[in-house]
Amino acid sequence: MEGAAVSAAGDGPAVETGLPGSPLEAVAGATAAPVEPRKPHGVKRHHHKHNLKHRYELQETLGKGTYGKVKRATERFSGRVVAIKSIRKDKIKDELDMVHIRREIEIMSSLNHPHIISIYEVFENKDKIVIIMEYASKGELYDYISERRRLSERETRHFFRQIVSAVHYCHKNGVVHRDLKLENILLDDNCNIKIADFGLSNLYQKDKFLQTFCGSPLYASPEIVNGRPYRGPEVDSWALGVLLYTLIYGTMPFDGFDHKNLIRQISSGEYREPTQPSDARGLIRWMLMVNPDRRATIEDIANHWWVNWGYKSSVCDCDALPDSESPLLARIIDWHHRSTGLQAEAEAKMKGLAKPGASEVVLERQRSLKKSKKENDFPQSGQDSVPESPSKLSSKRPKGILKKRSNSEHRSHSTGFIEGIVSPALPSPFKMEQDLCRTAIPLPSSPEADMSGKLSLKQSATMPKKGILKKTQQRESGYYSSPERSESSELLDSNDVVISGGLSSPPPDPARGTSHSLSCRRKGILKHSSRYSDGGTDPALTRPEMPTLESLSPPGVPSDGISRSYSRPSSIISDDSVLSSDSFDLLELQENRPARQRIRSCVSAENFLQLQDFETPHNRPRPQYLKRLADSSFSLLTDMDDVTQVYKKALEICSKLN
């Protein structure tokens, strides 16, 4: 299945389509970059009656949509397994939807890449459009992650390299996908990536701006949700950042329970990094930059050291960065950026603590992978309002993709899906129609809400269940194009819109208390989630403190005279806890213990140039932390003779980048 597409045998002339000279190019203009000659991708076009059942044996249904369904089938003569997508024309009520369906066929027929679903044949008559396409037997990448909960770094890099390779090929040929998500990424027999669903894709030019605010909310970039014009590739780069975060951590970076919180998180690039760090966190932060000019391009991603770690060659054949250093030096630079970012984040938190009412704004902690919505499932504003003058229309900012839909409106297409390129004299099917989408989305206006959203991560009374929650229900397949409406769009009709799909965690129960109220928990030194937690500090960043002498009384003889079963239930004490009765002889209870520095201060960036100060016994780390220090990111430097020179070189590169 992988490799160049094979044209199927059949009646009728074969029409070879490609980006150079294709009908789509004649309509939408030239591509963004010169297209290199490549092997022609033959696609049969049939415009006459043809009985498919004579050539294909239809099997089970893979997915359903508004306009038809996708079935698995086997070609009788060759035995090749294909996916057959049938579209009923009588269900297409809007001409623009037909334009986008034909555009998807043109673009997918023009692309020829081993990690993009191929189209073999297209049949069309007055009633139907039937597309014979490549079949990916392993299904969606979403389901693959759902079964495994979390992928290894090696497997994640394998998948991400193939995704980046396909997206780079699209951008090089002037095509932007605009709907990259786990549901639109399929797997073949050999677990190789196959990108599908080009229903929202379009050609772009570097000197033009697009104004179609489409895509899935959980993967949408800040310029999409805020209704700002964009060039195109930067939208795919943002979606790649969300995909990489999800592949590594198994959760979504932006996971607000309502559309206002989601817009605020995306607009500020506000996401939580799990306590278990990954070497790809620097690349994720680069791809999730709010400013599109500072965001990583597809060439930056393809040449990043993490993407190419363990491989002899880069993902793409594009030019690498000049004077690129070794991956080791890149990791030092990446660590430096992370350290400065954490310091700035801590300062922002301290400033937010001083503001009144800061604890009232809660940022829901994302802990689960959610099924994303199709673009036309977003709530939309009514279009039957009173017409406004052109001056008022031009003064309004265009709307984003997260809009409220009135209950009386049930159109199958999205006004946010209408395509427009900011350039004059375009043919009518591709002209700008942004006049239909002018309602701006209200953004949170309180600065306290933006600055203190992270203050109550630990104060939420109820947290969503960690992991990937999947509901077994019939839904659309990744083969289906985005203009088609899914079954769960009615969930977005209320005022408090829930962006998450059927796999989302339930919202917090109001009966259990507000999110900023502290949960009832017995005081004392109790182990929580295999780490010591004080309720307000990240457990991974906190060193366990020495217990008081009062807390070291034998469990069987409590000081207050109450039996152990009432004073401290055994269910809240971990078997491997340091405070268990079998481990009291391991505690160090010297009264005049000299104060020791924390690990972070011992190996901080500022003291790297004065390593000789750490040779005294007073400043050496405690023995139980030696293994943790050896396993940290600084262990990469232990095999080098001159640590100071490497760090100085990294600082010079960081200063040049800044």
From Swiss-Prot:
The GILK motif mediates interaction with PPP1CB. Residues 378-393 have a biased composition (Polar residues). This is NUAK family SNF1-like kinase 1. Serine/threonine-protein kinase involved in various processes such as cell adhesion, regulation of cell ploidy and senescence, cell proliferation and tumor progression. Phosphorylates ATM, CASP6, LATS1, PPP1R12A and p53/TP53. Acts as a regulator of cellular senescence and cellular ploidy by mediating phosphorylation of 'Ser-464' of LATS1, thereby controlling its stability. Controls cell adhesion by regulating activity of the myosin protein phosphatase 1 (PP1) complex. ATP binds at L62, G63, K64, G65, T66, Y67, G68, K69, V70, K85. InterPro entries: Kinase-like_dom_sf, Prot_kinase_dom, Protein_kinase_ATP_BS, Ser/Thr_kinase_AS. It catalyses: L-seryl-[protein] + ATP = O-phospho-L-seryl-[protein] + ADP + H(+); L-threonyl-[protein] + ATP = O-phospho-L-threonyl-[protein] + ADP + H(+). One of its GO terms (molecular function) is protein serine kinase activity. PROSITE patterns: PROTEIN_KINASE_ATP, PROTEIN_KINASE_DOM, PROTEIN_KINASE_ST. Residues 559-568 have a biased composition (Low complexity). Its main location: nucleus. GO terms for biological process: cell adhesion; DNA damage response; protein phosphorylation; regulation of cell adhesion; regulation of cellular senescence. Residues 1-53, 353-422, 441-568 are annotated as: Disordered. It is an enzyme of class 2 (transferase). The active site is at D179. Phosphorylated at Thr-212 by STK11/LKB1 in complex with STE20-related adapter-alpha (STRADA) pseudo kinase and CAB39. Not dephosphorylated by the myosin PP1 complex when regulating its activity, due to the presence of PPP1R12A, which prevents myosin PP1 from dephosphorylating NUAK1. Phosphorylated by STK38L upon stimulation with IGF1. Its EC number is 2.7.11.1. Disruption phenotype: Lethal during development, no live-born. At 18.5 dpc, homozygous mutants suffer from omphalocele with a failure in closure of the secondary body wall leading to organs outside of the abdomen. Omphalocele are apparent at 14.5 dpc when the physiological hernia is almost rectified in wild-type embryos. Expressed in the developing central nervous system, in epidermis, and some other tissues. It comes from Mus musculus (Mouse). Belongs to the protein kinase superfamily. CAMK Ser/Thr protein kinase family. SNF1 subfamily. Its cofactor is Mg(2+).
